[in-house]
Amino acid sequence: MSTATALPPRRGRDFIARHGETVFNRIGRIQGDQVELHTPLTRRGFAQAEAIGEALSARMGESPALTLWSSPTGRALQTLAVIAEHLDLDWHATRQDVRLIELGFGSWGGETLTALTARHGPVVHPHGMAVGAPDGETYPAMAARLAAWLSDTHDHDGDRLIVMHGLSSRVLRGLMLGLPDDPYCGVPVAERLPQGSIVMIADGAESLIHRGMGAAAA
């Protein structure tokens, strides 16, 4: 899988954010890649998005030259709308790409972690990455679509903000940082971060911009 990451660092900084807490997150229910399943942010989720916006605004000022990217899920777009308002950027200019969505969980989508654990045993690896559903997307398949997005957008110069999900953002960051394959998932996986966190990747190195206060597993 690591051969898919053989790209030099992109010309520009990448700010990668994990969306805020949703009503499904709050009760431990799996969301996955179902774009049509709109699970809105909670008040805590909106506060997390506000905190990201404040952190970026303090760092970059008003109306920075920043291309907006997002997973097409409602929870990612809601989070980005709040951040964009802090930066005085046009949310309607957001570039949505389905390749940025969360891992697909097949028939597990919409199920609670408690119910799945009762039927199948532990469904979260020790480092926070979920166990893939039998009829769901595999981690190598997710890594392949994320690597394709990286390749297709590699020549886009300038800074960009990407709002996405817990599992998919960890794999995207792992690919960008050239990390070794994770023994549980078989693909590069970066450090886990709480919901409402944002990092910056520049010249192949990652730095934390804001650590969120979320508590979701990934």
Label each residue range with its predicted role:
Residues 2-13, 58, 89, 101-114, ...:
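Acidic, low-complexity terminal tails and accessory targeting/binding regions
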